[in-house]
Amino acid sequence: QGYFASHYPLIKLPGTFYNYSTGTTNILSLIMKNKLSQNGIDYYDFVEKNLLIPLGLKNTTLEFDKSDTFIGGSSVYASARDYAKFGYLYLRDGVWDGDQIISKDWVDMTRTPSKHTYNLYSNKFWHVNEFRENAFNFPTDTYYCAGFGGQYIMIIPSKDLIMVRLGETYNTSTNTLLSFLGEIIKEVPNI
């Protein structure tokens, strides 16, 4: 999928227009796989050594395409506890058990919405903007991963809160689901 997406023609020059695309995540996976393999490192072994094992993610599966490239835009399957650990890593500035797993600079950049995405997105995480805060009762520091069918890992630093939502909600609108999650978040006191 990364190979296919990387050979699709650009419609706009990079940095001039924002449109969400899962394909770009698959391109990043392909680039990462190629860089790692140039150094004799297997992609899965790298992820396992640097993320899965340190965080104790025992119920997490990554899906790879036929070219052995991680389908990064949609194919991480995990338990709610494992997703929560991933969110907690970001809540704690990339530190797990005293070890810096993800650089604080990366986490800070992830927490800062990109102006190129109308302040909606950064480093594969969605952000709350003024519209979403008002509509769904989210604190403005909320950022989250949103997966197919209504999977969410929500990180809310002002409440010291991680919220994971799993389930199949293909027939429920995103706004209905986010409104429901916002009502739950609203009841959690700020720290």
What kind of feature is each model-predicted range?
Residues Q1, T24, Y43, V47, ...:
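Stable alpha-helical elements in mature extracytoplasmic
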Residues Q1-T69:
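Catalytic-site signature segments of enzymes, centered on catalytic residues
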Residues Y3, L57-N59, T112-V164:
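Active-site Gly/Thr loop motif
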Residues I11-S21, I71-Y77, C145-G149, Y170:
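Solvent-exposed loop and edge beta-strand segments that line ligand/cofactor-binding
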Residues F46-R111:
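Active-site-proximal binding-pocket segments
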